[in-house]
Amino acid sequence: MNNGDSNRETDSTTRSDQSNLRESPTRSPSSEQCSMVATTSRKREWAYGGRGTMASLAKESQENFQYMAEELEKMGNQFFGYVTGQSVKPSSAYISDVIILRDIQLRDQCLDVLREYGRSRRNGLFGFSEEGDHIHVIHDCSYTNRSCRDIWLGQVKPFGTVQKTGKPVKYIWEFKRTDWYDVFIYFFIRKRGERAIYIRGESGKIPSNDECVRWAREFKEREMVSSSDCTDYYECEQQEHKISRRSDAGSTNGRLYEKKTYSAGKFAYIRQKTKALLRKYYVSPISAICDVPEFRDDDLLCDPKNRDYIQAACEDFGKDLNAMSLREIYNLLTEDYNFTDDKELNPYAQFISSMKYDNLEGSLNIVNELLKYQCNDDEDLIVEFLTNLVNVLDRRIPKLNAFLIISPPSGGKNFFFDMIFGLLLSYGQLGQANRHNLFAFQEAPNKRVLLWNEPNYESSLTDTIKMMFGGDPYTVRVKNRMDAHVKRTPVIILTNNTVPFMYELAFSDRIIQYKWNAAPFLKDYELKPHPMTFFLLLSKYNITF
């Protein structure tokens, strides 16, 4: 953490300055000297404390050090509590990396990936600080075989390259508390972009912008910690003498960041083209866009080397849908087009899937007939059914996040809801949650809606299912990956049999239940209802969405 050469130079400079001040007490001070000797001794000593570390500051002034240490402990009590506590493994390594973004427009997506990973990391420390076109990442690591294999390294590949700091890896046992002070100051006080700390998956406290400004004002903290955590090409200190030195040497590039950054170019094109095709064909599942002829005719999109870019673009499109309400999805699919005209479909919504859809008129007739049959031809019951369904799908009611239909086989449950899954597109299926299936819920993260068909679960998972049906955040196991965080995602449950959560009191406010009957007349229909029929149905019964 500490730069020994820098510290020695700073210490000698400091002693020289102190000697000069003591030997010339009667000299008329300049305005700069006045600013150094004004007010309290704490500020006076710090002003000429130079470009040191907390360890060197402790040697210069215990009073100054103690005051600053107290302030740091207040701002980063969770951080220091972990790195100096009993739960951290001394044999773990401290790793510091820099993500150099290919384009600044990719920054927010990269930060989302890092936040998601931080929340899913169930052990250790993970933190990042963003500075425009690059992002610093720190974490502790088992460092097996002297290498880091954390999965976030692969997750950020579509957004840029990861560079090491160039400094030898240090282990936790080598750090003193003053070293951790330097780390915290450098990454979470001096940096003013997006910052985050995660400790065992929980978000930790970081200094607010006001606290950072107060820190800088109180301690003149512009050059406190060395830039030793930066890469050789990616130094973050705005040091004018370095720029001028390069210019004096005849360099044609006077910029501080000498490493040439990549333009968005290739990835930007792939992302834009892939998302445009997804809007045009609206395939289900999203990954099936690779089977569309227009996609396969594009040499760049079909290049195996670009597989990671394609996957990132598909995930990004899915996340776009996850954040949309039903109204926003309706607007996406009906831009400048009245889809009630069944002679043609919106060119941005061709709904390619493995099944064949009926036309809009035929779809509306059969779906309406099914609802009348299941609701005993009672229009009020149909309105209630559709209203409750929209409330769940749009997350309108707190703690109400599940919609269940129980019926004998051939009741039309899947016939009806396939229409909705084709509309929302980004959906996941939950499996049978028992001791033989540890990854039953691995499709839950980053989805617009979840389907649980014929649910079955062990009692040990009751609390997790309560959180799922109540819209609370929870984590799930994912095969060959870290545990994943799941935000509120509506759950559709279709079953032929009674399940414990249908009658347990704890679930009564978390789930809406309907009982349907067998619908034998559906066997005469070979085609599935068109997804856009759902919006026609809502309009027919004046349901607000």
Curated annotation (Swiss-Prot):
Residues 1-39 are annotated as: Disordered. Residues 12-277 form the PV NS1-Nuc domain. Its main location: host cell. The endonuclease active site can probably bind other divalent cations. Residues 346-545 form the SF3 helicase domain. GO terms for molecular function: ATP binding; ATP hydrolysis activity; DNA binding; endonuclease activity; helicase activity; metal ion binding. Gene3D superfamilies: P-loop containing nucleotide triphosphate hydrolases (3.40.50.300). Keywords: ATP-binding, Covalent protein-DNA linkage, DNA replication, DNA-binding, Endonuclease, Helicase, Host nucleus, Hydrolase, Magnesium, Metal-binding, Nuclease, Nucleotide-binding, Transcription, Transcription regulation, Viral DNA replication, Viral genome packaging, Viral release from host cell. The keyword Chloroplast does not apply. Multifunctional protein which displays endonuclease and helicase activities required for initiating and directing viral DNA replication. Also plays a role in viral packaging and transactivation of several promoters. Binds site-specifically to 2-3 approximate tandem copies within the origins of replication (Ori), unwinds this hairpin region and nicks one DNA strand thereby initiating the rolling circle replication (RCR). In the N-terminus, the endonuclease region is involved in binding to the origin of replication. In the middle, there are the ATPase and helicase activities. The C-terminus probably contains a transactivation domain. This is Initiator protein NS1. It comes from Diatraea saccharalis densovirus.
